[in-house]
Regions:
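Short beta-strand/loop motif that positions the catalytic acidic residue
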Residues: 130-131, 136-138, 142
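Conserved alpha/beta-hydrolase
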Residues: 1-8
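Hydrolase active-site cap/lid region
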Residues: 56-115, 132
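Catalytic histidine-centered segment of alpha/beta-hydrolase-like enzymes
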Residues: 169-183
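Alpha/beta-hydrolase active-site loop
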Residues: 12-38
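Catalytic histidine neighborhood in serine/cysteine hydrolases
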Residues: 154-173, 188
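Gly/Ala-rich beta-loop-alpha elbow adjacent to hydrolase catalytic centers
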Residues: 43-47, 51
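Short alpha-helix in the alpha/beta-hydrolase fold that links the catalytic acid
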Residues: 132, 145-155
Length: 206
């Protein structure tokens, strides 16, 4: 589904926009064909931020959560915005204008910095709280989300987390010609989700 502030999402990104994702869980709870005890979430980049929040706030309703390159704290600090996100070459488009678009009435760099301070999971006093079981994937060479944010998440909470860190990978752990998205998804993420949900992984014919 589209995350807050993107695509057809009905609301913009904000410190409380995770309420939209909680409504999705409410809806799934009304569907008779859905096993309410085996709901998982997977998030990528900004989606990984929301996935991390949901792993904390909706721990009781999520069986497990996998996230790729989740920003947690340093990503939202002024120094990182100015030194790493502004003019970032790893992102396919102009990242700062793209970030402005997910927030309501944010049109300047100073406003981005102000909004980002509110989004930090440390500033929201969430990092360190209990979480659902998590798989955290990242690349050490990521220029969009600092690897320190990943380690900060791994070091927090109440239960051990599974990690897949590619020392030669960039954003999402991708490595050109070695670890493209399909390989990461099929060989790392899907087996982990299947194992944690008690489901049989798809064979190579699917």
């Amino acid at each position: 589904m589209d995350g807050p502030g993107t695509g057809q999402s009905p609301i913009k990104a904000s410190p409380t926009a995770d309420r939209m994702l909680s409504r999705v869980l409410d809806y799934l709870g009304t569907r008779p064909e859905v096993d309410k005890t085996r709901i998982a979430m997977h998030g990528v980049s900004w989606g990984a931020y929301w996935g991390t929040k949901m792993a904390i706030l909706e721990k009781a309703r999520l069986k497990c959560v996998s996230v790729q390159s989740p920003p947690t704290d340093l990503f939202f600090q002024k120094e990182f915005v100015l030194n790493s996100l502004l003019g970032n070459r790893e992102y396919l488009f102009d990242q700062i204008p793209a970030i402005m678009a997910i927030f309501d009435n944010v049109t300047t760099l100073d406003q981005v910095v102000d909004e980002f301070q509110k989004m930090s999971l440390v500033n929201q006093h969430l990092l360190g709280q209990p979480t659902a079981p998590m798989l955290i994937l990242a690349g050490t060479l990521d220029t969009q989300v600092p690897i320190s944010d990943i380690y900060k998440l791994l070091d927090s909470g109440d239960v051990p987390k599974d990690a897949w860190i590619n020392p030669k990978g960039g954003h999402l752990g991708r490595q050109v010609g070695v670890w493209p998205d399909p390989r990461i998804f099929n060989q790392v993420i899907l087996p982990w989700l299947a194992r944690n949900l008690g489901a049989k992984p798809l064979d190579d014919k699917h």
